[in-house]
Amino acid sequence: MARGSGQLGGPHRDTVTMPKRGKRLKFRAHDACSGRVTVADYANSDPAVVRSGRVKKAVANAIQQEVKSLCGLEASQVPAEEALSGVGEPCDILDSSDEMDAQEESTQERSVSRKKKSKRHKEDPDGTGEEYPMDIWLLLASYIRPEDIVNFSLICKNAWTVTCTAAFWTRLYRRHYTLDASLPLRLRPESMEKLRCLRACVIRSLYHMYEPFAARISKNPAIPESTPSTLKNSKCLLFWCRKIVGNRQEPMWEFNFKFKKQSPRLKSKCMERLQPPIQYQDVHTNPDQDCCLLQVTTLNFIFIPIVMGMIFTLFTINVSTDMRHHRVRLVFQDSPVRGGQNLRSEQGVQVVLDPVHSVRLFDWWHPQYPFSLRA
């Protein structure tokens, strides 16, 4: 009995203490050497082997410290000083510590980026730039495409002034001129020596010689897909008609209405057009500025009332009664129509053209726009 009671009451000295289930193992920084790094420490390892699926930050910092020490770098330059300050001391690798480190790094990156931005803003507090001479802009203008002239002139005042000079437009004309170009008499090289209307003549010639501009006007259909709305409140300056004899047995009639669009400065009193320098006024003179031509071709002659000097207020294109052609209706008033004002059917002078073969709208730079040789 004594033997049995003694064995039951005494402690078991040779009992081995087992680790608790689920407890993480301790990580020692000196264990993370090049000889003990396994494939399981990297992101491409099997997730079944490594639960996290990525390299622990302390492992990466330890390897980084070892590499830098081998390269002769001081330990103070290693980013993870605090985690590896005591070599040989245990440090627990917890997910929460990784998240806190990531937050600290993101905070430091944001502070550094803010400092860089503040330095950039402090470099030029007045916002003043460097002004280049006019000759530099004139040299750069020699490499500008015709469709980029507007963007080039908006760079600065000197760039805009260059586009006002006669030298700029003369060089632009010579750059795109070819001997086989079919040009009207006013747009030929011997007539381009005149400074008056030089800019307008060069722009007109580009629609004959410059392929991108010529391709734009060649795509215009005989009947526009939508009714043009740019002619509203335009003034009719001139009207004429002529007989067209073609392949058809019966001739067609062409009715032309020359309009002058409303000037932008009339729409808003605060808006004023930028005027070129006085010495270049002749270069920018254009009698047909803001003008366009409405050309309507009909299958027979139609009587047209006098509409010159009146304001064009309504333009509609519908299907004709025979369902094979189109019908054009024009309405003219004595005064412009304000926004939102409705017109009655009996108001104004109405012009009805039916049946219509074609409807075309030409701006002043179009090759088919009639302009005076004295321009």
Swiss-Prot record:
<dbReference type="InterPro" id="IPR026509">
    <property type="entry name" value="TMEM183"/>
</dbReference>
<comment type="similarity">
    <text>Belongs to the TMEM183 family.</text>
</comment>
<keyword id="KW-0472">Membrane</keyword>
<dbReference type="GO" id="GO:0016020">
    <property type="term" value="C:membrane"/>
</dbReference>
<protein>
    <recommendedName>
        <fullName>Transmembrane protein 183</fullName>
    </recommendedName>
</protein>
<keyword id="KW-0812">Transmembrane</keyword>
<feature type="region of interest" description="Disordered">
    <location>
        <begin position="94"/>
        <end position="128"/>
    </location>
</feature>
<feature type="compositionally biased region" description="Acidic residues">
    <location>
        <begin position="95"/>
        <end position="106"/>
    </location>
</feature>
<dbReference type="InterPro" id="IPR036047">
    <property type="entry name" value="F-box-like_dom_sf"/>
</dbReference>
<keyword id="KW-1133">Transmembrane helix</keyword>
<feature type="transmembrane region" description="Helical">
    <location>
        <begin position="299"/>
        <end position="319"/>
    </location>
</feature>
<feature type="region of interest" description="Disordered">
    <location>
        <begin position="1"/>
        <end position="21"/>
    </location>
</feature>
